[in-house]
Curated annotation (Swiss-Prot):
PANTHER family: PECTIN LYASE-RELATED, PLASMIN AND FIBRONECTIN-BINDING PROTEIN A. This is Polygalacturonase. The keyword Metal-binding does not apply. GO terms for molecular function: polygalacturonase activity. Its EC number is 3.2.1.15. The active site is at D94 (proton donor), H130. InterPro entries: GH28_Enzymes (IPR051801), Glyco_hydro_28 (IPR000743), PbH1 (IPR006626), Pectin_lyas_fold (IPR012334), Pectin_lyase_fold/virulence (IPR011050). It comes from Rhizobium radiobacter.
Length: 312
């Protein structure tokens, strides 16, 4: 029996788990696999979980789960290479697509880890879900060369979301590109969060501390995130929130070639990322310990401001 409760307002969920729910479809070490023209509904946990797979295509398909069902991610490639997701409709209770690369063991074990590289997402509809395209939080093996383009994300909590979790996990995230994507009715459009608090130890001081720590094999790195031609409508909380580590500030490149079209006039200020001590806000672009480059900040109306102004 698995017990779970979901908090409202994008604030995460408490989920005491007594048993592991089954995946909808768990593919292990598969090569040259095609998943075409199918519908999967109401999986108990992650709907499709390719693990250690290579040359995988999923196309012209539908993935559905109740909107209040915990952990029902749509498609989670883990330690995979060369994955194409095209023309898939997602309507799930958690992240639509969450790219993962494993997690170190409790004593730092890493012999089971392998990188994820070469993930392409095209012509997909995400409506709704917690995140449209998510990296992490299990990313110890490293995630590289991920592209999402020509997609619509409607009513998702986040559009593009990176969450690295604890400092002990390690891993490198690099060359992540989002382009020609519509974000409509999202809460926070773009986020990178190195203090993600929803893991078991997420509220511990060594995860949430904003003080520098020694850089070692357990330090996660995020570098080379590019966003181009993204249109944001009915925005609730923030266009972009980037909270990195003081040990290694995230390098995030924003090519803002389309303006924010509109805010949701009914939205209430809310903490825009899942990290401790961040107060409610409604801002355009905020950052802390992150190197943010915006081609034309005027398109965002407000210059970037420091998120530390919103720490409790």
């Amino acid at each position: 029996m698995a017990l779970a409760t979901r908090a409202t307002g994008g604030a995460g969920r408490r989920k005491p788990v007594r048993a592991r729910c089954a995946r909808g479809l768990h593919l292990v070490s598969c090569h040259k696999t095609q998943l075409l023209g199918f519908t999967i509904r109401n999986a108990a946990s992650w709907t499709i979980h390719p693990q250690g797979c290579e040359d995988l295509t999923a196309a012209a398909s539908t993935i559905i789960a109740p909107h209040d069902s915990p952990n029902t991610d749509g498609f989670n490639p883990e330690s995979c290479r060369n994955v194409m997701i095209s023309g898939v409709r997602f309507s799930v209770g958690d992240d639509c697509i969450a790219v993962k690369a494993g997690k170190r063991g409790p004593d730092g074990e890493d012999d089971h880890l392998a990188e994820t590289r070469g993930i392409t997402v095209r012509h997909c509809l995400m409506q709704p879900g917690h995140g449209g395209l998510v990296i992490g939080s299990e990313m110890s093996g490293g995630v590289h060369d991920v592209t999402v383009e020509d997609c619509d994300m409607i009513g998702t909590d986040r559009g593009l979301r990176l969450k690295t979790g604890a400092r002990s996990g390690g891993g490198m995230v690099g060359n992540i590109t989002m382009r020609r994507v519509l974000l409509d009715g999202v809460q926070t459009a773009l986020s990178a969060n190195a203090h993600y608090h929803c893991d078991a130890d997420g509220h511990d001081d060594w995860v949430q501390s904003r003080n520098p720590a020694p850089v070692n094999d357990g330090t996660p790195f995020v570098d080379g995130i590019t966003v181009e031609d993204v249109e944001i409508r009915n925005l609730a909380h923030a266009a972009g929130v980037f909270l990195g580590l003081p040990d290694v500030p995230s390098a995030t490149s924003l090519s803002a070639t389309s303006p924010i079209v509109s805010h949701d006039p009914s939205a209430v200020a809310t903490p825009p990322i899942m990290a401790d001590r961040v107060r409610p806000m409604r801002m355009r672009l905020v950052f802390e310990q992150a190197d943010v480059v915006c081609d034309d900040p005027a398109l965002l109306n407000d210059a970037p401001v420091s998120i530390s102004s919103y720490f409790d």
